[in-house]
Amino acid sequence: MPLVQSRRRFLTTLSMAGAAGFLRTPPALAGEGPLETTTVRLVNDRSICIAPEYVADELLRAEGFTDIRYVEAPGGQQVDALVRGELDFCNFLGAFIPVIEAGSPIVVLAGINIGCLEFFAREGIRHIADLKGRTIGLRAAPVELLKLMAAEVGLDPVKDIRWVAASDGGADPLELFVQGKIEAFLGFPPEPQELRARRAGHVILNTTTDRPWSQYFCCMLASSRDYVRKHPVATKRVLRAVLKAADICAAEPDRVARRIVSGGFAENYDYVSETLRDIPYEKWREYDPEDTMRFYALRLHEAGLIKSSPQKIIADGTDWHFLNELNRELKA
């Protein structure tokens, strides 16, 4: 897997964050002890919704990191990359919970943002239940999430729906949807923004606004159990930087959008700006990530996709003590 060199430093973000007081050296640093490592490897999966990780560069430098790398890994492959030791932190979705049950040493640390996924369909299809016997396209969205959404409305996720994924190596699923060759598409930003710009289909589910999905985190930050055990100080400082970056995304979406484009993480400013304005990044302060893990684990269990109880998943695959400390420290 290729390593992408550290992105051009977001110098304007430095002044922006500095003006807001974000880049002051946290007073707790002296009591935390020295960093176990000054290198950190974050994911670049080309999704706009993980913007806080993309703009955490200068915040991480203020925390003492000197070598900040972004590793390219598609959404469905980043958990495997983390387990292989190619990443230090990755984006984790509730639909990935089966990997925790399977024994992968994943530790979910915090929720970062809600929403961002949108389900598009052709005319005549108004609800996910109408997709029985239809074909759905996926680029970045994981198949596991599609199965969960199907099960949530009473469909058999194995027998009642078909899907075409970018990982299959065939035609681009988004283009198949635009051309009318498949009936629906489940997308992460910037895919929904592109479909709207091309006037393709209509939205039948938006996880930012539609219950129950809007009540829980979509993207969470995870690391490996080994990394957290060996680097507790680094773990807390990375999490602090990413959570502060989420606050910046909420406060200055247009300026953050410019930094993401100039940093090479995305190409279309309008798509990025729309995404950042739509996602309520400030919700990390209000929502409980354990509720999210419980919700997804229960739904996966009810759908027959996992056997473990939510309690076991939470016990085996989460560590909230860093977040609890930062919630007290960063209280507005």
At which residue positions do the language-model features occur?
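Short, glycine-/small- and polar/acidic-enriched structural segments
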Residues: 31-179, 183-189, 204-205, 215
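Secondary-structure end/capping motifs
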Residues: 229-308
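N-terminal secretory signal peptides and thylakoid transit peptides that target proteins
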Residues: 1-18
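Short, solvent-exposed loop/beta-turn-alpha elements that line the ligand-binding surface or hinge
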Residues: 64, 209-214, 281-289
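Conserved C-terminal helix/tail region of periplasmic/extracytoplasmic solute-binding proteins
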Residues: 301-332
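Phosphate-coordinating loops and pocket residues in cytosolic domains that bind phosphorylated ligands
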Residues: 12, 133, 197
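Pocket-lining segment of extracytoplasmic ligand-binding domains
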Residues: 94-95, 171-262
